[in-house]
Amino acid sequence: MTHITTLGKLLNVLSFYRWAFGDLTEQDSDIGMLAEYLVGDILNCLPPTRKVNAPFDLIMKDGTSLEIKATTHQRVEKGRNPYYRWDVSTQSEMLKGNRPIADYWVFLMASFPREASRTPRVVQAFDPKNWKCYVVSGEKLRTAGCTMYVSEATLRRLGVEPVPIAAMKKVLNAEMQSGRDR
């Protein structure tokens, strides 16, 4: 059923989603949902529906837990080069060690050509070439002491480099293997 009648009006579910999420690129929370979807699809671990209050964003078939963070916004501060950072404050208890931490974290950044492109940004958001990501183990991230934000500089200090989203699965598998080898 895609139409419902309420208050004497015929409402369309698709129209609501178009209105609410028409530009997924405006807010990190919206782009975060898309990032979760893309990562889950790439890793073949999408649950039937998204659970907002689940302990972890995604759980792979082998039980590996993932936390997904995404941003489209570069921060600009006087005297600094533009940089990306991700808000992890809602996971601060996890990062402080007060509750189990996700096995791996995937930090994604998306950049969409704005005025130069005739392709709508919502369509660009589904194009893998517009995404890069960092993959880091939860334990390595916990040692960094971040409880509010994680920046690119933090990830690089931890020895993590960005990769195209298309290479994420390969990098995650290598990280998982090196974790098993320790």
Regions found by a protein language model. Name each.
Residues 1-65, 69-182:
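Nucleic-acid endonuclease domains
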